Amino acid sequence: MNPRSAGGPRGVVPPGSHEPAKRGGSEGGRPPWLNMRLTVVGSSGSIPGPESPASSYLVQAPFQGRTFTLVVDLGPGSLGALYRYLEPREVDAFALSHLHPDHCLDLCAYYVLARYSPTAPWPRQPVYGPRDTAERLSRAYDVPPLEAKDTDPGPTLAGHFDFHDWQATQQIGPFTVTTVPVDHPVEAYAIRITHNVPGGGSLVYSGDTGPCDALGELSQGADLLLVESSFVEQPGNPPGLHLTGKQAAEVGTRAGVGAVVLTHIPPWHDRDAVLAEALPYFPGPLSLAVTGATWEIG
């Protein structure tokens, strides 16, 4: 972590230990915290890296006497890492920023668990994502995209997941989730998650995007901006694809967010160099996403 990690901003408790949290939260399934919590499951950009799976994040909060868990993206390698924090069947819902493999492909592995594990069949979990998510993931696993018509969910992803196209705003458990399209070669969304309690915190996740006004507008006043920083400052970066650390920090400054966390840095870039490029352009707490790090927001 960089020197600005200490002494959290408004509504954000500084990142906790990078050691994996205990699975299942506290006794009875109730979390030992009251606010929304972000945990980094995987943060490697574009591919899994030697120190981290590809993109995946837990967003959790108390809800109806227990912990509600929203998994945001589930890239390659992240399902295995998820076991460090909870039993996978305890996931309440999934949110997919877009359908590039590094953000969604382990949902196919999750399907294997839901269908074949000793505790199967599992309840159908909601999956929120771009149009045709069910069809695209079904093709990836080479199973029929349509739900089976009998009582056995059978070899279909739609038999095990309840797919929803992203709307501008939706309620998911204790969260209001707002999405906007961002600038990427495929249908892609930035996601704002607000905890529905008095004084509840807000988190914005950029997904993958090049510079665009929509991300800044969605991020206005957020407590924490989890923002991709795939590029370094150099000539020839292609437009409409990714952000540099500097550009990510500038989004946070213009939007007046409380803290910035840089993520989605590919293994071929020096993470510390990306951080160094960003530091001069954001005046508040700024850090790198590290597997196992947590932030309390609210």
Regions found by a protein language model. Give the residues of each.
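N-terminal non-cleavable signal-anchor helices
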Residues: V13-P14, A222
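Intrinsic disorder/low-complexity segments enriched in small, polar and charged residues
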Residues: N2-V13, E27-G28
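Cap/insert and terminal regions of metallo-dependent hydrolase folds
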Residues: P211-E296
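Binuclear metal-dependent hydrolase catalytic cores
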Residues: E27-Y205, G210, L215-E217, L275-G298
